[in-house]
C-alpha cells in the first residue's frame, strides 16, 4: 500500500518479506498465514517482544517441531516509509494450539529480541570504576554484542562509581545500573528499554522535556473531517490505567519518605541517609505544569515526607558475612 493510500489508523503495509519465519528448513513467508500480530514496546521492559497468531493449514507446526532455533523477521509499518518496524526476533514459545477444522489449526508464536536469549545464557562477574553510562555501554557492546547502530541513546550519568556486578545476567545488570544512576540534576529516573530505534538508557525527565514525536488519536475513527489525515495515522483503541492511588502502599514502599542504612565493612561504621519525596521530586522534570506531590500532615502533625521510618533499606547480614569472608581471603593471599 503506497503512502498516499494510508488514511486510517487501522491500515498498515507489509513490506516484501515483511513477516518471514527463518527455520532450519528454510524461509517461510507468513504474510498469508498470520491472523494477528502484536508487538510489545514499553519503557519498563528491557527489550521488545510480541506474539503472532498463525492459522496453519499446511502442517507447519508438525514439520518444524519448534525448538527455539527459529527467527522471525518483521518489516511492517503504517506506510513503506513511516512508522516502520524492521527487526529480527527469536521464537521462544508456542502456545494456545487449537484445531480449527480437520485440516487446519491455530496457535500463538511468542517472540522476543535475540539479546534476551543471549542475556539468559550469560552472566557478568566484573568490577567497574566508571560512570554508569560507560558501564551500560560496555555491557551492551561486549556482553550483548550490539553494534553501534542498535544502541540508540545512552544519557550521561553523574559521578564515577565503584561497583561489582555479582554473577548476574546482562539485563539484570542493566536494570541494576538504571536503579542507581542519577543525571547531572541528581534525578534518579533512569530507565533501560528497547524501542524500534534501538536500545535506550535515559531519564524520564529527558523524555518528558523532549518534543512529542507524534500524537495519539483516541477519537472515533473515519469521521471524514478536513485536515484529519495526520491524526488518523496513529490511534489507540483504549486507555488502560495500570497504577491507581493507594496511600498505604505508597507509605510502605517509601514513596513519600525513607531511610537508607549503609554499613562499611572495612571501617565497621554505619551510615544513615534520609530520603524525602519532595527532595527527589524537585530534581526531575514533570509533565504537569502544577504538579501535585501529595504532601499532608498526619495525626502527629508531621508531614508525610518527613516520616523517614516509613521504609528503611539496609544491607542484609548474609551479604556482609559473605563479603567479609571474601575480603579475609584476599588479605591472606596478599
Question: Where do the protein language model's features map onto the residues?
Answer:
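Short, charged, solvent-exposed linker or helix-capping segments at domain edges/interfaces
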Residues: 120-124, 211-214
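Extracytoplasmic/secreted envelope proteins and their assembly/folding machinery
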Residues: 133-137, 174
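Short beta-strand-centered interaction patches in the first periplasmic/extracellular domains
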Residues: 106, 113-115, 152-247
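An acidic/polar, Gly/Ser/Thr-rich interaction patch typically located in mid-to-C-terminal regions
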Residues: 37-65, 224-334
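Alpha-helical support elements that line or immediately flank enzyme active sites
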Residues: 126-131
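N-terminal export/assembly leaders
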Residues: 119, 136-165
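Assembly/oligomerization scaffold segments
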Residues: 1-121
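Short secondary-structure capping/junction motifs at helix and strand boundaries
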Residues: 82-86, 146-151, 185-189
Amino acid at each position: 500500500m503506497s503512502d498516499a493510500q494510508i488514511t486510517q489508523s487501522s491500515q498498515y503495509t507489509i513490506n516484501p518479506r515483511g513477516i518471514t519465519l527463518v527455520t532450519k528448513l528454510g524461509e517461510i513467508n507468513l504474510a498469508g498465514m498470520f491472523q494477528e500480530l502484536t508487538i510489545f514496546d514499553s519503557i519498563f521492559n528491557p527489550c521488545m517482544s510480541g506474539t503472532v497468531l498463525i492459522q496453519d493449514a499446511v502442517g507447519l507446526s508438525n514439520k518444524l517441531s519448534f525448538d527455539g532455533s527459529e527467527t522471525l523477521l518483521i518489516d511492517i509499518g503504517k506506510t513503506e516509509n513511516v512508522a516502520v518496524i524492521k527487526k529480527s526476533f527469536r521464537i521462544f514459545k508456542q502456545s494456545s494450539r487449537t484445531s480449527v477444522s480437520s485440516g487446519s489449526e491455530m496457535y500463538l508464536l511468542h517472540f522476543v529480541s535475540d539479546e534476551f536469549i543471549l542475556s539468559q545464557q550469560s552472566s557478568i562477574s566484573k568490577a567497574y570504576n566508571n560512570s554508569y553510562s560507560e558501564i551500560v555501554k560496555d555491557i551492551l557492546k561486549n556482553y550483548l554484542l550490539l553494534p553501534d547502530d542498535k544502541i540508540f541513546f545512552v544519557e550521561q550519568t553523574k559521578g564515577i562509581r565503584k561497583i561489582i556486578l555479582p554473577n548476574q545476567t546482562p539485563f539484570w545488570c542493566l536494570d541494576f545500573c538504571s536503579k542507581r544512576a542519577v543525571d547531572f540534576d541528581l534525578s534518579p529516573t533512569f530507565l533501560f528499554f528497547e524501542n524500534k530505534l534501538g536500545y535506550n538508557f535515559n531519564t524520564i525527565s529527558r523524555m518528558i522535556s523532549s518534543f512529542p514525536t507524534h500524537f495519539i488519536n483516541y477519537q472515533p475513527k473515519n469521521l471524514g473531517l478536513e485536515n484529519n489525515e495526520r491524526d488518523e495515522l496513529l490511534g489507540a483503541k483504549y486507555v488502560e490505567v495500570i497504577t491507581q492511588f493507594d496511600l498505604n502502599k505508597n507509605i510502605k514502599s517509601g514513596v513519600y519518605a525513607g531511610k537508607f542504612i549503609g554499613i562499611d565493612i572495612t571501617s565497621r561504621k554505619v551510615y544513615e541517609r534520609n530520603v524525602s519525596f519532595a527532595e527527589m521530586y524537585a530534581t526531575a522534570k514533570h509533565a504537569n505544569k502544577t504538579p501535585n506531590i501529595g504532601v499532608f500532615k498526619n495525626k502527629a502533625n508531621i508531614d508525610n515526607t518527613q516520616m523517614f521510618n516509613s521504609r528503611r533499606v539496609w544491607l542484609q547480614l548474609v551479604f556482609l558475612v559473605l563479603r567479609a569472608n571474601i575480603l579475609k581471603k584476599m588479605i591472606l593471599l596478599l
